[in-house]
């Protein structure tokens, strides 16, 4: 059972927190993480690409010349795929790229992603971050104190002041515990969780 230090926003020790082994000490299987990340990214694709087939390209109604007697190769339409300005054969058509991943597999992958950050000593737990006003400079100062360059910060609940102060800092992404995803965890080398966010995630995944 892992016990991690809890820091305040100035990176001073503020206590300890015991992490649930069934959430933070799960064997990592890359093939499951790969499946869930692929499903996530596939779901982001719009799939609106389209090329014109012979059914959609304009023109091509009349036969260019008679079938026999001209000495030329026979042709039935000037919108054939072999003609300049003709249709596209087997081109991309609108489609849905997303595919379903079972809920249990998604939850398992989330546990694996969290476990990988703990095992790699890239998980930091903080009491919380409080800012007196919406100001990027203030959040940047806190990020500097915590040693954050490229990190995913997970808050227990939505905080407009924090969200607006952090959104312009390159490499820092701030989300709430209920928005947590495998893709976001793996995208950032460092994971910073508020103490309340840890409790929320553990309650959801146990």
From Swiss-Prot:
CC per GO annotation: ribonucleoprotein complex; ribosome
Q: How does it assemble?
A: Part of the 50S ribosomal subunit.
Q: What gene codes for this chain?
A: rplD
SUPFAM superfamilies, from UniProt? Ribosomal protein L4
Q: Where is this region: Disordered?
A: 55-80
Q: Name one GO biological process term.
A: translation
Gene Ontology MF annotations:
rRNA binding; structural constituent of ribosome
The protein's matches in InterPro entries, at most eight in alphabetical order, are given as: Ribosomal_uL4 (IPR002136), Ribosomal_uL4-like (IPR013005), Ribosomal_uL4_dom_sf (IPR023574)
Tell me the classification of the organism that encodes this protein: Bacteria, Pseudomonadati, Thermodesulfobacteriota, Desulfovibrionia, Desulfovibrionales
What the record says about family reads: Belongs to the universal ribosomal protein uL4 family.
Biological role: One of the primary rRNA binding proteins, this protein initially binds near the 5'-end of the 23S rRNA. It is important during the early stages of 50S assembly. It makes multiple contacts with different domains of the 23S rRNA in the assembled 50S subunit and ribosome.
Q: What keywords are assigned to this protein?
A: Ribonucleoprotein, Ribosomal protein, RNA-binding, rRNA-binding
Judging by the UniProt lineage, the source's domain of life is Bacteria
User: Is this entry keyworded Ribosomal protein?
Assistant: yes
Kindly provide the name given to this protein in its UniProt entry. Large ribosomal subunit protein uL4
């Amino acid at each position: 059972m892992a016990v991690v230090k809890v820091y305040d926003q100035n990176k001073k020790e503020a206590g300890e927190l015991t992490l649930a082994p069934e959430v933070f000490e799960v064997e990592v299987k890359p093939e499951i993480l790969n499946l869930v990340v692929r499903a996530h990214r596939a779901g982001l694709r719009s799939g609106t690409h389209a090329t014109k087939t012979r059914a959609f390209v304009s023109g091509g109604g009349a036969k260019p010349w008679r079938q026999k007697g001209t000495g030329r190769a026979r042709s039935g339409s000037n919108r054939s795929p072999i003609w300049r300005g003709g249709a596209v054969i087997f081109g991309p058509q609108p489609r849905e790229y997303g595919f379903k991943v079972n809920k249990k597999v998604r939850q398992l992958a989330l546990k694996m992603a969290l476990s990988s950050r703990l095992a790699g000593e890239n998980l930091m737990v903080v009491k919380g971050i409080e800012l007196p006003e919406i100001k990027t400079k203030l959040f940047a100062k806190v990020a500097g104190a915590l040693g954050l360059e490229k990190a995913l910060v997970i808050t227990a609940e939505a905080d407009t002041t924090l969200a607006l102060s952090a959104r312009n800092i390159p490499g820092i992404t701030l989300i709430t515990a209920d928005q947590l995803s495998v893709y976001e965890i793996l995208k950032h080398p460092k994971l910073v969780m508020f103490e309340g966010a840890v409790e929320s995630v553990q309650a959801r995944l146990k």
